[in-house]
Amino acid sequence: KNYRDVTFSEKIEMMSLLQTHYYKKKYIQYKPLSSNVFPYFENQVDNSYISLFYKNKKMVGLISGRPLTVNLNNSSFITYYVDFLCVHSDHRKQNIAPELIQTHYYNECYKQPSILTCLFKKESHLNNFVPLIVYNTYTFNMKNWITYELHSCVNIININSKNIHILVDFIRNNKHKYKCFITCSISNLLKLIETGNIYVYCVIINKKVYASYFFRNTSTIYFNKKSIECFGTIQDCSDLLFIYAFSNIAYYFKENYLFITIENISNSSTIIENIVKKHKYLYDTKTAFYFYNYATYPLKKEEYL
C-alpha cells in the first residue's frame, strides 16, 4: 500500500517486528526508533510503498520501497530502493521473503507503471546475480583515533535547511566524476537531516567547497555502543586536507558514537587506507547493490556514489 495509507496501528506492528527480528547477532543489534524508520518515506516527490505479510492476523513480514534518482550511463531514471525487508524469526525458511519481494514489486508496478526497476542492497552473503557494484564495508572502534589540526582558514559546516544550497551546488559540479550517482530528493534529504538520521558536512575555504562527507545513523549497536556510518564522500581537494577534515568530523562523532562503519565507495578509500595504517578494523563486510530489471556492467568502487 501507499505509505500515506499505513495506519498508526500498522506502524506500531512494523516497529515491533523490526526491533525484534530485523537484525540480531551476539554483539550486533539493530535497535531503531520510529523516528529512524518513517522519515525515509516522508517529504518524497514520488510515492513510497509498504507491503505487509500476515499469518493468523499477525504481522510476520514487511518490505518497503522508496524512490531514488539514478544517474547512470549518461541517463537518468527513477528506481525504487527496497529496504526494511524483515521476516519474523519463527516464520523464516517458509518462502515468505521471496513472496514479499515478488508481490511488492508487482503491486508497485501496478499502482505506478512508471516504476521499471528496483535496487537492492546485500551484505555478507551475496546473491549470484550480476551486481551493480561490490565493495567492502569496514567497521572501526574510534576510541584511540587522533585528530589532525586544521589551518584556521578551513571551515567545516554541518548542512541544514538554511545552507543546503551549498551542498546542492557542490554535488552538481562534481557528480560527473562518478559513472553512477544515486540520490534521494532534496526534500527527503532535508527531512532525514532534520530528524537526525543523516548528517552531511562540507569543507569550505574562502567560500569554496572542497569536500563533503555523508553519514547515517544506522541504529546499529556494537557491543552495547552506538555506531555511525559514513556512506559516501566527495573529494575535490588534496588527500591531506580530505583526511584531516574527516578526522575532525570523526572527533565530533566520538562524543556520541564509539564505532564507525565506512563504505569503501566514491572517494572513501583514501580515508580507509589512512586509518588502517594505524588501526585494525573490527569487521570487513562484503557489500553489494543489485538492480532488478536493469542490466549493466559492474562498476568499480570509486565510480559509484
What are these regions (language model features)?
Residues 53, 65, 78-81, 88, ...:
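Fungal eukaryote-biased detector of long internal structured cores
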Residues 9, 46-48, 60, 77-80, ...:
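Eukaryote-biased feature marking scaffold/signaling PDZ-domain proteins and nuclear chromatin regulators
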Residues 51, 63, 85, 213, ...:
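Conserved GNAT-family N-acetyltransferase fold
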